[in-house]
Each structure stands twice: as structure tokens, then as C-alpha cells.
Amino acid sequence: MELPGAKKTKTGYSTAADVLENLAADVPFVADILEYRQLAKLKSTYADGLAHCIEADGRIRSSFQQTVTATGRISSTEPNLQNIPIRMELGKLIRKVFHPKEGYVFVDADYSQIELRVLSHMSGDENLIQAFLQGQDIHRSTASLVFHTPFDEVTELQRRNAKAVNFGIVYGISAFGLSRDLGIGKKEAQKYIDDYFLAYPKMKTFLDGLVEEGKEQGKVTTMYGRIRPIPELSSSNFMQRQFGERIAMNSPIQGTAADIIKIAMVRVHDRLQKEGLESRLLLQVHDELLIETKTEELEQVKALLAEEMQKAADLSVPLEVDMHTGNTWYDAK
């Protein structure tokens, strides 16, 4: 068909997702192929896969491990209930099949931007700390500083780009990676990163310090002392060393956030038990707790969730919790 943007491989034209996505806007049936693939994946992995895990009482029980991930996050297997899609609407609909028992509702409590809050605390950067203390939209605040624009005049595009930089910095993103994510040139992406570090001057010092710590000690640690060995930093392979630097920057932040959510889980569980409530903690998905809540206990559970999650760590910025209630997991998210 000689489609524009088509990519050829040794065996013929590529049908990889990224290639098809570039063609979809100009060729309608390509969009249909992508949608079909998405639906087939959802059916085989989630609809059919989860159906095989339903037990006699109608519940699905997963196994949770504390020692599998290098960052300290809890992982879920058989089945994995932490990877139910959230970024695509069709995938999110899978959550509609999860509902509480009669007389109960779901309460979903999710830490808001916890890794950025941990980063602000650990780096001690006053500009980032003040933005959180003042309750500002952190992405709009970053856009204002990076693009030298008054806070109230920041455009949605500027905010979206600043959001990508905010979260990218946590993962040690490169100019190449940011340029690919935002669809901009590498030079422009590097300027975004440079301006970010000018806006938050202590951030670069902190992140560079983590890399140096990793190189000198062969490891980095979380705020609570969790150790992450980084043998990649002493590799003879340049790409491996770069990967190691990203690990050094991210692990103390992501690992500290993982430690905090575990502390919150213990606090919430103990409080539910102490107050003799019938509501119970069902699931943890990284920064999110799902509680099967007795209807009569709803307000009490919401209050204790907010209190215990916010008090789980004493940071220089507040821990904020977004909370939603629903008759299905989908409605509560």
C-alpha cells in the first residue's frame, strides 16, 4: 500500500504498535487494528485470566510478596491485581467486575503525588517545599518557574510538559527520553531539564549526590534505611552504568514511598481492629489502598484512613490523600 511512515524489517513491513500508531491518524482501518489488539489483550489477560481465579465464594485471592521488587514495593501474583489497566478507558472498565459484599462499599484512598513529596523532603529544595505547603498545583507551579510565566497564565500545554518533567526527573529521565515523550527536539528537552534544575536548585545537588553515593558505596538507601545495591554502576558497559545512575536517583525516592505506604497499611489495619470495625483492608496497589467498608462505618473509615495515611510519615510537606467511594472498584477510583 506504500503507506507514509511505514517501516520495513527483514521479513516485511513492521506492524509494531508504535508504527501503527503513527499511521492510525491517516489510515482509519489501522486504528481498528489497534483497537482489536487492545480488546484481545484485555480479554485474554484480564477477562478470561481473572475468571479462572474466581473461587467458590466469588472472591479472587492474590498472593503478595514483600521481597521480590528491588525498590521495596509490594508485588502481587496469582493473579496480579496490581496491574489492572488504569490509563486506558477500556482497561479501566475491568474494575467494574470487582464489587464488595452486600451491605458494603469500596473506599479507595490514594496518596497524591507521594514521590514528588518525598523528593521535596529528601532534597530540601525550598521552592518545591513551598509549592506543596501552599497547596499549589505542583505541575502548574513548575511550569511557571521553568517557562518564566506568571502562575495564572500557564497554559495547559505548559502544565502538561511540566508534569512530564516533574515525573521524569524522579526517574532520571534523559533529554532523549523527554524529547520522545513530549514529541519535541532533544535540544528543547535538555533546556526544559536545565531550566527545571535552575527553578529547583537543590534538586540537582541532591540527585547528583545519590549517584556519587551509589558509586562510592555500591548502594543507596531509603529514608528508612532500606538498601538497594547497584552493581550496574561499576559495569564496564556504558549503558549499564547509565541505568545504574537512574536507579541511584530513583530508588531512594520510590523506596521511601513504598516504606510509607507499608507503614500506612499497618496503621490502618491496626486502627480498624482497635475500633472493632467490620470494614477491612483488601488491596494495596502501590500508592493506593482499597477498603471493603461496611456502609454504616463509611464516615468513620474515611476519617481514620485520612488520619492514619497522613500521619504515616513526618515530612517537611503534608501527605495528601485522594479518596473516592463506590459500589464497584471502577466507581471508587
Which positions does each model-derived feature cover?
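Short, polar/flexible loop-turn hinges at active-site or ligand-entry regions and domain interfaces
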Residues: 126-132, 150-154
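Hydrophobic (often cysteine-bearing) scaffold residues that line and stabilize catalytic clefts
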Residues: 115, 135, 139, 257, ...
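Short active-site loop/helix that positions an aromatic residue
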Residues: 113-124
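A common structural junction motif
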Residues: 200-201, 307-315
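A structural signal for short secondary-structure junctions
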Residues: 99-102, 274-277, 282-286, 313-316
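Conserved catalytic core of nucleic-acid polymerases
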Residues: 25, 61-62, 66-69, 144-277, ...
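Conserved "right-hand" nucleotidyltransferase catalytic core of DNA-directed polymerases
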Residues: 1-89, 99, 105, 112-115, ...
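Conserved short beta-strand edge segments in small beta-sheet-based binding/regulatory domains
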Residues: 314-324
